[in-house]
């Protein structure tokens, strides 16, 4: 039994049975079921995320992400005392997901406990586990916006955390755009942290020392010594000292090289006895065999060691079984093979000579071939690269990881090119199946071994553990809440869908024992998403580079909706913005549905005064005014429930079946009525190539027809929103333009909706132009949906520097030019240039504004005159990419006024602060606890619906009895939301012909109605 919302055409619609279809090569419609597990095989492209970060974070004047901007903002946050939200009820509750992790570049098993470890995400902070990673707790003493790159624990127990990674920083080749803040230390097992003196970048630029610290290592011999590989060299540091012990590697004292080491230290490994070091600096490799006192450059042009003298980046590993055995894996740094494996090498004589053990991986190869950094479209060894030696007395083995992990074994005295064994898969099991024991999330960045010989891997999906040297894996992400969301959507019950970086489109259905559990619906990067507020089984989502998917059953099956552009092309925008408009009662609709009832329609009444004449005569039948009839919608798979306002007359021929009786048989009804289809729904998707709209988002008996409504897009689309009445579509661009497309309520045909057509009815106007991407658009819904378009529109603007990050126009729907969006971002001067990514105007009091920024959420209760920080409750200072509020009436949803926040690093949050304060009382005043019980259609032939009004959210019981009192069927539903026209469907196909009574109970209240079953 399902509870559905009805749409009356004042209006109610119920969904008929539906299925998924696509068009095959012959143009025929065919069923297309795609299991979730197949979508999980789709890989991500890391450069796409970089592209998007640059579009919304870059300095509005230079077009680049500037390190100085980030530093000045972070310093201001620490030094300036911010006003807190005046109403302390603005508290945020984490919704998770608590079973999905985020990008992890550092894992540290702690020495004081065999089951304690710390893991660090590039956004979201540090987390600690005391049960081997089974569950995690946030270390609140560490700033969540710092990029964690490496962790180490000294022999004296001190824990160090390095920040900033060369694979994340803005080096001009495309990265996430953030550099580090230096080196931090904790002397209390991670409870509190402080910046180590002289280890903060100053000035805060990419070339400043400590801008990136890719790797730190504890000295195995000296319990007070830490080795640091930064962007400008390799250092030794004594715990507690105020200055560096400058290592000889940073000077010119290298035995066979006079060129100073000023390139970023990419990787370091130290033997367990502390004597052998191997260091990668830029494209040079150095080895020390005396505890780091002296180094030798081993891959110079005339070294003849067998190593290449140039490469893009590299990882190193010293055997955990034999210090003389070491490994090096390299990545191509430029050209068509950029990001592919350049070669993997092994040495068995302490690094004197090296042998190739894996050649350059096949460029453009298939996923089944050995290509550890290839994701099916591009290679990204520059981004994800891991190499580790397996501690094993019985075999000498290594694991090389990137997109997937591969194992290699040394089987002879002289290493050579031998087979590599793939040890994990990047796709999960299918729905309802147990987790795959070999699943590890793609994009593998780091590894760590604990004292029990367990291997941990840090990935874009969090932490994984193997207890058998990579043979099988366990996901360790419970409460490791570090997911990076791009966009979110919700349904009337508060269930949430969100698009994430490299973690799919995630669905939180709030069911089961863990309401923070999320299910992945499609693989790769999930970006834009929407959910119907009237048919919540319908959900829309997109994948990186433009592909749009849809589900009609809340994620049980997901199918391709439409390819509006060449799908998956690297030239497409990384993200796809989308906007769904739903109006259940559009008085301006020009869509009319033909209606001709069957002669046995239960709604027809035959005039009693018609004289029965010989066969062939015509009689008049009518549907009386006030009747509620059901009609199939035009080109959308739902049923209109229409209340007849005046009698509708139809005409029918009849014949006598027996000349001596009045038994009649009627032929088809002759006339057709045309009924206005007031419920109207539109779905828009925006790309650089153009903006597309369909009026058939719920069509499944074929492919929804999309129209190109605008092809003048100046740049990437970064935001979209409809006006409440659906007459205007607002489109924001990376270039800083805001465009209004108008007259959708006058455009109903293909010609009227297709740009370039002679009958094109839409009007395009640029209504704002400025610096910084338009990251969000919010329209004032406080005036309802059918009283003309709301003139009041707010926008948020991304990018560091500049001003006016939140702007409002009071005439956005009618203005004919630019200049009406006024700056309402009245924050302390230090924060005027903070990027804003999202904005909400409260449905009940539009002077209440919430802004999602680079560092959390801000609140204004006076239309932007003043602002205060609103990171209360469980919210922290992380980027908030999406803020959305439930705008539907409180009697139709259970989450009216609730605001949801999608963060890029700490998952999803919600606040009930703006929940309509009198919603329950209002409902109770207007609607009895239980009222207006109806069965339709009545008589019933097979399926039917029971409609009722419910004054409060409650558990309900439904009983169906035969006329003689026998119980035929019983149903129970928990926590049915308050509202009018609640609906329960039932199937009477197996009922005998006759009369029945339906009884509905809510606590001590009950109501009943009769219905008849016929055939």
PLM ranges: what are they?
Residues 1-11:
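N-terminal Sec-pathway targeting helices
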Residues 514, 917-920, 977:
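Glycine-rich, phosphate-binding/catalytic loops in enzymes
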Residues 9-20:
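Hydrophobic membrane-insertion alpha-helices, especially the h-region
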Residues 19-20, 25-915:
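Beta-propeller blade termini and top-face loops
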Residues 914-928:
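Low-complexity, Pro/Thr/Ser/Gly/Ala-rich linker/spacer regions in secreted
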Residues 192-194, 294-296, 353-355, 557-559, ...:
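Ser/Thr- (and often Asn-) enriched beta-sheet segments in non-cytosolic proteins
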Residues 924-936, 940-1015:
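C-terminal outer-membrane/trafficking sorting elements
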């Amino acid at each position: 039994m399902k509870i559905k919302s009805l749409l009356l055409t004042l209006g109610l619609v119920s969904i008929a049975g539906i299925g998924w279809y696509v068009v095959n090569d012959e143009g025929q419609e065919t069923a297309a079921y795609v299991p979730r597990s197949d979508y999980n095989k789709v890989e991500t492209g890391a450069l796409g995320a970089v592209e998007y970060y640059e579009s919304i974070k870059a300095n509005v004047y230079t077009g680049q992400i500037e390190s100085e901007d980030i530093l000045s903002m972070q310093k201001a946050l620490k030094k300036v005392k911010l006003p807190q939200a005046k109403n302390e009820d603005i508290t945020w509750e984490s919704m998770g997901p608590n079973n999905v992790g985020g990008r992890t570049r550092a894992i540290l098993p702690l020495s004081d406990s065999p089951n304690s470890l710390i893991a660090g995400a590039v956004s979201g902070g540090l987390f600690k586990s005391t049960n081997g990673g089974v569950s995690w707790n946030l270390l609140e003493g560490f700033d969540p916006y710092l990029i964690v790159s490496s962790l180490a624990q000294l022999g004296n127990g001190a824990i160090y955390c390095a920040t900033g990674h060369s694979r994340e920083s803005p080096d001009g080749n495309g990265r996430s755009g953030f550099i580090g803040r230096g080196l931090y230390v904790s002397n209390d097992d991670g409870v509190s942290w402080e910046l180590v003196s002289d280890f903060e970048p100053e000035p805060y630029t990419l070339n400043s020392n400590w801008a990136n610290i890719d790797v730190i290592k504890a000295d195995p011999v000296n319990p007070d010594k830490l080795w640091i590989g930064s962007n400008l060299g390799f250092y030794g540091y004594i715990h507690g000292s105020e200055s560096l012990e400058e290592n000889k590697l940073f000077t010119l004292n290298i035995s066979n090289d006079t060129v100073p080491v000023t390139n970023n230290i990419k990787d370091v490994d130290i033997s367990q006895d502390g004597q052998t070091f191997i260091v990668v600096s830029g494209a040079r490799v150095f080895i020390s065999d005396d505890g780091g006192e002296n180094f030798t450059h081993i891959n110079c042009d005339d070294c003849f060691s067998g190593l290449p003298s140039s490469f893009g980046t590299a990882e190193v590993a010293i055997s955990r079984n034999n210090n003389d055995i070491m490994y090096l894996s390299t990545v191509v740094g430029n050209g068509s093979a950029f990001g592919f494996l350049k070669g993997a090498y092994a040495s068995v004589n302490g690094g004197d000579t090296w042998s190739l053990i894996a050649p350059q991986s096949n460029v453009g190869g298939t996923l089944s071939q050995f290509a550890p950094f290839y994701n099916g479209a591009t290679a990204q060894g520059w981004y994800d690269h891991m190499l580790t030696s397996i501690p094993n007395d019985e075999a000498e083995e290594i694991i090389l990881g990137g997109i997937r992990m591969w194992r290699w074994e040394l089987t002879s005295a002289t290493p050579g090119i031998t087979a590599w064994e793939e040890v994990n898969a990047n796709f999960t099991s299918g729905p309802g199946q147990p987790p795959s024991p070999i699943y590890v999330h793609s994009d593998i960045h780091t590894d760590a071994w604990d004292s029990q010989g367990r291997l941990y891997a840090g990935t874009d999906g969090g932490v994984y553990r193997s207890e058998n040297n990579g043979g099988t894996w366990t996901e360790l992400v419970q409460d490791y809440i570090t997911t990076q969301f791009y966009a979110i959507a919700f349904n009337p019950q508060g269930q949430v869908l969100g698009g994430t970086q490299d973690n799919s489109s995630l669905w939180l259905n709030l069911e089961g024992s863990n309401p923070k559990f999320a299910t992945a619906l499609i693989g790769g990067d999930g970006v834009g998403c929407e959910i119907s507020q009237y048919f919540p089984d319908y959900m829309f989502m997109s994948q990186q580079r433009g592909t749009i998917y849809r589900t009609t059953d809340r994620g049980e099956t997901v199918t391709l909706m439409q390819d509006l552009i060449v799908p998956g092309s690297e030239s497409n925008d990384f993200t796809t913005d989308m906007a769904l408009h739903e109006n259940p009662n559009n008085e301006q609709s020009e869509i009319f549905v033909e209606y001709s009832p069957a002669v046995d329609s239960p709604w027809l009444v035959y005039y009693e005064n018609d004289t029965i004449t010989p066969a062939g005569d015509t009689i008049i039948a009518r549907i009386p005014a006030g009747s509620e009839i059901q009609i199939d919608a035009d080109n959308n798979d739902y049923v209109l429930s229409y209340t007849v306002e005046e009698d509708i007359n139809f005409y029918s021929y009849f014949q006598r079946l027996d000349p001596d009786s009045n038994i009649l048989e009627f032929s088809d009804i002759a006339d057709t009525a045309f009924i206005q289809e007031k419920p109207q729904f539109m779905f828009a998707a925006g790309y650089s190539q153009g903006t597309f709209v369909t009026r058939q988002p719920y069509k499944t008996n074929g492919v929804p027809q999309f129209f190109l409504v605008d092809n003048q897009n100046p740049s990437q689309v970064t935001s979209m929103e409809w006006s409440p009445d659906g007459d205007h579509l607002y489109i924001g661009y990376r270039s800083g333009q805001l465009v209004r497309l108008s007259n959708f309520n006058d455009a109903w045909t293909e010609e009227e909706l297709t740009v370039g057509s002679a009958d094109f009815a839409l009007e395009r106007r640029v209504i704002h132009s400025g610096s910084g991407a338009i990251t969000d658009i919010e329209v004032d819904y406080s005036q309802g949906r059918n009283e003309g378009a709301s003139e009041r529109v707010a926008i948020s603007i991304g990018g560091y520097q500049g001003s006016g990050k939140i702007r409002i126009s009071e005439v956005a729907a009618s203005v004919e030019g630019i200049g009406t969006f006024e700056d309402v971002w009245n924050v302390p001067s230090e924060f005027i240039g903070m990027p804003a990514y999202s904005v909400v105007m409260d449905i009940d009091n539009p002077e209440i504004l919430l802004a999602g920024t680079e560092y959390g959420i801000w609140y204004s209760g006076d239309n932007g005159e003043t602002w205060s920080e609103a990171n209360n409750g469980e919210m922290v200072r992380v980027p908030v990419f999406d803020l959305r509020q439930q705008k539907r009436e409180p009697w139709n949803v259970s989450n009216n006024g609730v605001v949801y926040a999608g963060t890029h690093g700490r998952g999803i949050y919600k606040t009930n602060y703006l929940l309509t304060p009198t919603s329950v009382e209002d409902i109770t005043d207007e609607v009895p606890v239980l009222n207006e019980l109806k069965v339709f259609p009545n008589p019933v032939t097979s399926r039917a619906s029971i409609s009722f009004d419910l004054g409060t959210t409650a558990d309900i019981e439904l009983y169906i009895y035969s006329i003689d009192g026998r119980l035929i069927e019983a149903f129970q539903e928990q926590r049915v939301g308050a509202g009018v026209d609640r609906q329960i469907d039932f199937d009477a196909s197996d009922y005998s012909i006759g009369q029945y009574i339906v009884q509905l109970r809510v606590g001590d209240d009950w109501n009943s109605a009769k219905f008849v079953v016929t055939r």
